[in-house]
Amino acid sequence: MKYDYKAVEAKWQKVWEDEKTFHVEIDHKKPKFYALVEFPYPSGAGLHVGHPRSYTALDVVSRKRRKNGYNVLYPMGWDAFGLPTENFAMKNHIHPAIVTKSNVDHFRSQLKALGFSFDWDREINTTDPEYYKWTQWIFLQLYKHGLAYKKEMNVNWCTGCKCVLANEEVVNGVCERCGSEVVHRVKSQWMLKITAYADKLIDGLDGLDYIERVSTQQKNWIGRSHGAEVNFGTTAGDTLTVYTTRCDTLFGATYMVISPEHALLKAWLEKGIIKNAEAVKAYQAEAARKSDFERSELNKEKTGVQLDGVMGINPVNETEIPIFISDYVLSTYGTGAIMAVPAHDTRDWEFAKKFGLPIIEVVKGNTPSNLDEAAFTDVATGTLVNSGFLNGLSVVDAKKKMITWLEENGKGRDKVNYKLRDWVFSRQRYWGEPIPMVHCDKCGWQPLPESSLPLTLPDITDFEPGPDGESPLARHKDWVKTTCPCCGGPATRETDTMPQWAGSSWYFLRYMDPHCKDALASKEALEYWSPVDWYNGGMEHTTLHLLYSRFWHKFLYDIGVVPSPEPYQKRTAHGMILGLNPHSFVNLPAEEQDKLLKEYGSQKAAEKALEEKYGEMSRHPIVKMSKSLGNVINPDEVVDQYGADTMRLYEMFMGDFEQAAPWQTSAIAGCNRFLDRVWALSEKLVEGEGYRPQIETLMHQTIKKVGADIETLKMNTAIAQLMTLVNALYDNGGATKAELETVVQLLNPFAPHMTEELWEKLGHGHNEQLAYYPWPKYEEAKCVESTVEIAVQVNGKVKARLKVAADITSEDAIAAAKADPAVAEALSGKTVVKEIYVKGRLVNLAVKG
């Protein structure tokens, strides 16, 4: 009977929903396992094929862990606040809440159609006031502990979207979304002091099971470095402080560079100290149109303006050195000023060459240098030269001596610095969590009483940001006007909202107890489920969401709300699913390729023509999926054509889980055929109890390998092993009931619908669902082959292959080799001078004569 995947999948999805198969409660009799995947932003486009790759992998792990006896929490929810929904709502004159509900309903139906074992009773939504009540509560705790504050700061301002943009959203001075000009604007923003947790965020990584690239990216993003702050005097009488990790090179500092936004520069301009003020102001205006990312690109041309009217004073030799402004120095890193040592820094060297500045070697290495041609940067080790009291010292000793000198002479001190900046926590938009703060002219900023939470969004119809950059909420005076919780006088609400990252910074805690009214989760639930045992997500979230949520969790731990210092014990990441590039020559239909070859004469010329038409991307056959390229795969269509189990199996089989992989429709059909072959085995049952001798070793090997591979996310090799086993069963005329039962059990986490149906077909009652049926066990001794194939070589050339006992002795193996007719012929008339047996692999006979 042909497998009817549509009927079977609908049947088991209904069973799981009706019987709440995957509903979970606290059970102290079982070990707990909390598996977490990043909850999706419910966009209007619906689920794409990239989502199920992560969800399926942890679903496979979760299903296996249930069968291993664990009490498994595997939840799902919606990260539903955000700009795309708000923009769609504005364009179509629909309230964002209505758009969000529609999108969530669509996503939910798509996920249920794929058979994920989520506990849907724990579903959460960041836009639900009962959820964001606790997001607001966490903000209030941060404020009360001095970690939330207001600050005037330079921000990227989109003149079209009328809101603050992250650096990543600015490309060539325009908004990535709308193409409008982006300018720097000073705005008062709410900030979260994540820098207070910089050390804890780095040091906490040591005890976690994070894949190496995740840990490395977080450490690099935080950017902890050990160096010194050095105070340079100026001819204007002020002090310029710089941070450097190479204070040993101070004698080689021949100029200084400050950021265009530096506070001292503003003061010097106001006092009339700067003689070339017009040129300086023009450069400041130009820099204001660039993002921090554009300004700090290493390969960009170095630009700058020397300040006419003020010089710096090198503290070690009292030499006056010029001061420049340049956009590659950022006000947000270090002190916004640097000392430049062009002999030993490529960027400083290029700048010095352009402006004709002195270049003084101060570190002599083991290899020769030519400072006329390039900076000598191999200076991690070496000996100090041209450096006064540091001459002859090693780099390590020179750093120590210079810091001592700076401190003794009041010229500086040792310092630990971080690249990490405090978190900008304001958005001038409607569709986000209201910030629970009010401003009173008498009392200043005051937090709302916790009893008044949640502070809900007003039900409005105009979501357009104001031309003055204010949030749309600012226009709704009835909502804005309130009373001060401190003095009872008139006050105004904060009209900025929280960023989308807010709700996702603690959602994993709410899953533990999603209906709790008195706290973000009950103490019992937090103590039972914490921490998350395994979290899988995208690498693109490593330095934003993952870092922010670790910060919030560590703060909640410090104030006694959660029982563990870290939120996630294990973090893995999946590779992106890529699509075929329709503009690449190799992906064109054959007739289109022939047409281009006739027109241009060669494939190389045709590819050049495609590049001229479509750009450099046409050279890449495999690219990121995008609507503009028309290569986006709709999972609904795949499920409709092949079934959910086939799609799940394919996404796990398509390659190394951690690496990007191209979507290949032809390979889906192969996975579908494999499932059909497994289904057909139920029609080919053979007589016999248990495992047959000729298949027993492979059965035990497969149980062992599939179990181990699931736990290390080597899903593709686990499936390949199952395919090998199924082929062997067909080669042996079919499967016994016990053999097929084991295949079904091992395949169940990957293809849960079909395997539940087969399990029932094999005579198991409804109370024996595979979802909780114990995982098969293997015996280590039976994983070892009783016989092995060895090669027999004569003078290095293979003459025969023999099947021998796996535990055969060296003497018996050599004797068996010599007894083989082909080997005996090769030895005829010759003298054996050396005999070697490599256990389980080969016999090598060296002969002469």
Describe each region flagged by the PLM.
Residues 1-46, 72, 201, 215-225, ...:
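Non-catalytic terminal extensions that flank enzyme cores
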Residues 1-36, 66-75, 99-106, 281-324, ...:
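Conserved oxyanion/phosphate-binding beta-strand-loop segments in alpha/beta enzyme cores
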Residues 2, 18-19, 91-248, 263, ...:
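Residue patterns forming the tRNA-binding/recognition surfaces of aminoacyl-tRNA synthetases
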Residues 3, 224-229, 237, 364, ...:
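Long, charged, mostly alpha-helical binding arms that flank functional sites
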Residues 3, 8-13, 49, 135-364, ...:
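NTP-handling and nucleic-acid-processing catalytic cores
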Residues 25-94, 100, 123-138, 244-245, ...:
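N-terminal catalytic cores of NTP/NDP-binding nucleotidyl/phosphoryl-transfer enzymes
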Residues 79, 144-145, 149-156, 414-443, ...:
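Helix-rich, typically C-terminal accessory recognition domains appended to large enzymatic cores
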Residues 214-241, 290-319, 323-324, 423, ...:
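Flexible, glycine/threonine-enriched loop-and-boundary segments that flank and lead into catalytic domains
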